[in-house]
């Protein structure tokens, strides 16, 4: 006997056996499909592991009690899913009617504009169409009267319903109806073929309470349809649009409770400074223009000063060369033994020029005096030969010397003197003058020296210390300065334009601020140098 006869039958099939059984089942189903396409549950004994899922699995029967799974034959007991999805509707051309979404919950007579053509104005093909004509006066009056009656009826009903006690409603007028019965004969309807029926509304009791309750909550009607969105089809966003839609988070400039490390660019983006338009004040442009003009003028002034310095250096160089040339010429003439009379002639010409210049000044002075007013003319004539000193030193006699003999005016018209016999003939007494020559106060002291009695209250007892002039004298003087010089003789003499400033101003006026002087100014320069050389 084989060993397999003693072993129990296997409960599980091998892979080969499963494949063979599947192949046989497919063949059987193929054979049965040719006969009948009806699907039925497997017979008893072969339902292990089988679960009915579809409606065809139940066949014509109900649920299988031996299969402990929720079963819904013919979908009985299955909860229906609630959905607000609408069934797709198409129009006569086969296009989907998207306006069904807007028409949901609305009456069929309500006009809803949901197409692009609704936005486009219609073209009037026939101007005489009666639908497009304006109503006449009779139609307007009729419609107005109907509207007024309907509104009055609605308002009266509302007012009457709100009143607690109201009068009885007016009865409608009686209506007469001609009635013809269907059964005609002597036995029916008392032998009458027609009857006239008078119909009257039954009178109502005004104190009768309302029969129907109307205080129930009526469900709210559907809302207004959503506005149709007429836009182009959606397109993919670009990178630039995505970056523009990035909204920076709200970052405080004062609080950071969590202690996060926030980059500076994110903090500035949250601040919103980049979103503000920058308005530049027009004064910045004015300031920049003013600075540019000032810089340009400063450069022009520097360049002009440099030109003036170069011209002065050139003139100095030319003067030095001319001097060296004259010295060389004199040395050559001295060696050759030739006597020159150039200096003598130059000296005579210089004297003649000075005389001409003085006479010209006198004539100009006379013309000015003749043109002046009478009071001013007398004042000029009075101060014509007046000598005004430069300074008045305090307590110092005038050091100016004069060639004229000066007399003391106090000696004249006196009863004493040499003619009176020297004090009555007493030779031993030398008192020719009754008082000292310098005993009286000088005019400068009377002008500038304050009186003690009047100014004592203001300045105090230290008046002598205040009026001393020693405090204005430096303790250590500069080298080369000698304060004990002799007084100058004659009026003050000034040098004539040592720096060439007048000449520079004349050139600037002539050329009108041009950067480079023209050649026409050179003769004037030589003429000015000649005048200066003659005055020297």
UniProtKB/Swiss-Prot annotation:
The modification N-acetylalanine is found at residue 2. GO terms for biological process: cellular response to retinoic acid; intrinsic apoptotic signaling pathway in response to DNA damage by p53 class mediator; mRNA splicing, via spliceosome; negative regulation of DNA-templated transcription; negative regulation of transcription by RNA polymerase II; positive regulation by host of viral transcription; positive regulation of mRNA splicing, via spliceosome; positive regulation of neurogenesis. Its main location: nucleus. Residues 470-489, 503-530 have a biased composition (Basic and acidic residues). Residues 59-79 are annotated as: Interaction with PPIL1. Residues 174-339 are annotated as: SNW. The keyword DNA repair does not apply. GO terms for molecular function: enzyme binding; Notch binding; nuclear androgen receptor binding; nuclear receptor binding; nuclear retinoic acid receptor binding; nuclear vitamin D receptor binding; RNA binding; SMAD binding. The modification Phosphoserine is found at residues 14, 182, 190, 224, 232, 234, 446, 479, 481. Disulfide bonds: none annotated. GO terms for cellular component: catalytic step 2 spliceosome; nuclear body; nuclear matrix; nuclear speck; nucleoplasm; nucleus; spliceosomal complex; U2-type catalytic step 2 spliceosome. It comes from the Eukaryota. It holds the Pfam family SKIP_SNW. The keyword Protein biosynthesis does not apply. There is a cross-link at residues 23, 81, 97, 115, 122, 141, 158, 170, 193, 240, 258, 286, 339, 344, 416, 441, 452, 509 (Glycyl lysine isopeptide (Lys-Gly) (interchain with G-Cter in SUMO2)). It is found in: Nucleus. Keywords: Acetylation, Host-virus interaction, Isopeptide bond, mRNA processing, mRNA splicing, Nucleus, Phosphoprotein, Spliceosome, Transcription, Transcription regulation, Ubl conjugation. Residues 1-46, 209-233, 311-386, 470-536 are annotated as: Disordered. InterPro entries: SKI-int_prot_SKIP, SKI-int_prot_SKIP_SNW-dom. PANTHER family: NUCLEAR PROTEIN SKIP-RELATED. Belongs to the SNW family. Identified in the spliceosome C complex. Associates with U4/U6-U5 tri-small nuclear ribonucleoproteins (U4/U6-U5 tri-snRNPs). Component of the minor spliceosome, which splices U12-type introns. Interacts with SKI, SMAD2,SMAD3, RBPJ, RB1, PABPN1, MAGEA1, SIRT1, FOXN3, U2AF2, DAXX and ATP1B4. Interacts with PPIL1. Interacts with VDR and RXRA; preferentially associates with VDR:RXRA heterodimers. Interacts with NCOR2. Interacts with MAML1. Interacts with NOTCH1 NICD; the interaction involves multimerized NOTCH1 NICD. Involved in pre-mRNA splicing as component of the spliceosome. As a component of the minor spliceosome, involved in the splicing of U12-type introns in pre-mRNAs. Required for the specific splicing of CDKN1A pre-mRNA; the function probably involves the recruitment of U2AF2 to the mRNA. May recruit PPIL1 to the spliceosome. May be involved in cyclin-D1/CCND1 mRNA stability through the SNARP complex which associates with both the 3'end of the CCND1 gene and its mRNA. Involved in transcriptional regulation. This is SNW domain-containing protein 1. It comes from Homo sapiens. The lineage of its organism: Eukaryota, Metazoa, Chordata, Craniata, Vertebrata.
């Amino acid at each position: 006997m084989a060993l397999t006869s003693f072993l129990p039958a296997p409960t599980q099939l091998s892979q080969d056996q499963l494949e063979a059984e599947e192949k046989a089942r497919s063949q059987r189903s193929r054979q049965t499909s040719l006969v009948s396409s009806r699907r039925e549950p497997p017979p008893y004994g072969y339902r292990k592991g089988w679960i009915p899922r579809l409606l065809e699995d139940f066949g014509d029967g109900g649920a299988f009690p031996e299969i402990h799974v929720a079963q819904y034959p013919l979908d009985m007991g299955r909860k229906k899913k609630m959905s607000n999805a609408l069934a797709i509707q198409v129009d006569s051309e086969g296009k989907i009617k998207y306006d069904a979404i807007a028409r949901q919950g609305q009456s069929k007579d309500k006009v809803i504009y949901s197409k692009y053509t609704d936005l486009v104005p219609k073209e009037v093909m026939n101007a005489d169409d009666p639908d497009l004509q304006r109503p006449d006066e009779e139609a307007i009056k009729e419609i107005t009267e109907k509207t007024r009656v309907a509104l009055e009826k609605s308002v009266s009903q509302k007012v009457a319903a709100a009143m607690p006690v109201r009068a009885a409603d007016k009865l409608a007028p009686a209506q007469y109806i001609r009635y013809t019965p269907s059964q005609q004969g002597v036995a029916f309807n008392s032998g009458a073929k027609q009857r006239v029926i008078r119909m009257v509304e039954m009178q109502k009791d005004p104190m009768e309470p309302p029969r129907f309750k109307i205080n129930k909550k009526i469900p709210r009607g559907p809302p207004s349809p959503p506005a149709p969105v007429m836009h182009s089809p959606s397109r993919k966003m670009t990178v630039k649009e995505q970056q523009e839609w990035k909204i920076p988070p709200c970052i405080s400039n004062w609080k950071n409770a969590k202690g996060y490390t926030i980059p500076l660019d994110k903090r500035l983006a949250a601040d919103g400074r980049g979103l503000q338009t920058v308005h530049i004040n027009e004064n910045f442009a004015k300031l920049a223009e003013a600075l540019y003009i000032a810089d340009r003028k400063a450069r022009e002034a520097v360049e002009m000063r440099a030109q003036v310095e170069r011209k002065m250096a050139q003139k100095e160089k030319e003067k030095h060369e001319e001097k060296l040339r004259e010295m060389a010429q004199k040395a050559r003439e001295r060696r050759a033994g030739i006597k020159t009379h150039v200096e003598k002639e130059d000296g005579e010409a210089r004297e003649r020029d000075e005389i001409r210049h003085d006479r010209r000044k006198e004539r100009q002075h006379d013309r000015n005096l003749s043109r002046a007013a009478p009071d001013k003319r007398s004042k000029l004539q009075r101060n014509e030969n007046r000598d005004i000193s430069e300074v008045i030193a305090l307590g110092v006699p005038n050091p100016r010397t004069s060639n004229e003999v000066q007399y003391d005016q106090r000696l004249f018209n006196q009863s004493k003197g040499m003619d009176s016999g020297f004090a009555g003939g007493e030779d031993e007494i030398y008192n020719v003058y009754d008082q000292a020559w310098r005993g009286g106060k000088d005019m400068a002291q009377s002008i500038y020296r304050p009186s003690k009695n009047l100014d004592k209250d203001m300045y105090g007892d230290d008046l002598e210390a205040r009026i001393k002039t020693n405090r204005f004298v430096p303790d250590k003087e500069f080298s080369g300065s000698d304060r004990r010089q002799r007084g100058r003789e004659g009026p003050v003499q000034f040098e004539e334009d040592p720096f060439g400033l007048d000449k520079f101003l004349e050139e600037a006026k002539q050329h009108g601020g041009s950067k480079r002087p023209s050649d026409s100014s050179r003769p004037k320069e030589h003429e000015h140098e000649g005048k200066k050389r003659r005055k020297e």
